């Protein structure tokens, strides 16, 4: 995973309103959706890694994990050849996640080209603590992290600042939906509202910083940051020229753009089965 793919996040990194530009239709980013069989043929690997893939494929054929759960196999003890083989097979899909954990470790998560399959690695410094391949709508570490932030109270409202236009009513709207799970998901689309920089600063102070950063690609790119409030996300979407398309606060456990759909998991299970069958047929006798 690239160490710099979050460099466009944060204040001052997005174009100002006077530089706003948008293509009539966003251009699709190219994402490979099939592993390169020619490349896999060149990768040395052991029966152990094939057994792990078969195990995960078998689990997926038996049941599809519900929201909040995953199926998983442990890759931590793979040798260098098997690790390279897995990297080649999985590739990089549309979603990348980085989570700063409370114990000072960091989880790096990359969706595979098989939608709903996630490579999950946790490190502390240079030490690799966990390496798993998970199948589910979202990785387990993300489900666990999104429940740890605060539930808000009115005492969290920051003091008003000069230049506020809609910041205060938007803050009350946001807090009301966070407190009521039945009112979620809810989106506050800043792009469609008259909003000042003071409003943005006020909402940012209300929500505070979070410990999760997500990048998705597809039609343009989306940069999503968890805030310090439970189930509140700040989302920015850009087109392929980095022009702004959307800025919003999303109030939900995990934004829908991050989740793999059930039908995606079914498709990935079928494709993984075909790859496992191909590997079995290609194995030397």
Task: Identify the residue ranges that each predicted region occupies.
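Short, surface-exposed polybasic-aromatic patches that bind anionic ligands, especially phosphate groups
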Residues: 53, 169-172, 176, 185, ...
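An N-terminal, globular interaction/scaffold subdomain
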Residues: 25-108
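Extracellular/lumenal glycan-associated surfaces
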Residues: 82-91, 194-210, 231
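N-terminal alpha-helical "arm" segments
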Residues: 1-36
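Terminal, regulation- and interaction-focused segments at domain boundaries
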Residues: 62-74, 180-193
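Surface-exposed beta-loop interaction hotspot
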Residues: 123-187
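Short, structured protein-protein interaction patches enriched in aromatics and acidic/basic residues
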Residues: 77-80, 96-119, 212-242
């Amino acid at each position: 995973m690239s160490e710099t793919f979050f460099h466009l996040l944060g204040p001052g990194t997005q174009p100002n309103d006077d530089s706003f530009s948008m293509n009539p239709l966003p251009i699709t980013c190219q994402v490979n959706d099939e592993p390169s069989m020619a490349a896999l043929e060149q990768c040395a690997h052991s029966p152990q890694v094939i057994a792990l893939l078969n195990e995960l494929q078998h689990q997926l054929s038996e049941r599809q994990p519900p929201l909040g759960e995953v199926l998983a196999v442990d890759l931590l003890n793979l040798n260098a050849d098997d690790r390279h083989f897995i990297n080649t097979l999985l590739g990089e899909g549309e979603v990348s996640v980085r989570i700063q954990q409370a114990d000072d470790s960091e989880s790096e998560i990359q969706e595979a080209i098989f939608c709903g399959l996630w490579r999950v690695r946790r490190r502390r410094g240079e030490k690799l603590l966990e390496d798993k391949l998970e199948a589910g709508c979202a990785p387990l570490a993300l489900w666990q992290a999104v429940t740890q932030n605060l539930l808000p109270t009115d005492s969290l409202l920051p003091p008003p600042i000069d230049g506020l236009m809609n910041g205060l009513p938007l803050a009350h709207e946001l807090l009301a939906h966070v407190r009521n799970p039945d009112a979620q998901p809810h989106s506050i689309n800043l792009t469609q509202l008259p909003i000042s920089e003071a409003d943005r600063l006020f909402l940012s102070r209300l929500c505070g910083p979070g410990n999760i950063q997500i990048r998705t690609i597809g039609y343009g790119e989306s940069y999503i940051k968890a805030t310090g409030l439970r189930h509140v996300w700040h989302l920015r979407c850009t087109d392929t020229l980095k022009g702004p398309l959307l800025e919003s606060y999303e109030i939900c456990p995990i934004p829908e753009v991050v989740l793999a759909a059930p039908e995606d998991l079914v498709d990935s299970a079928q494709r993984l089965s075909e790859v496992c069958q191909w590997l079995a047929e290609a194995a030397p006798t």
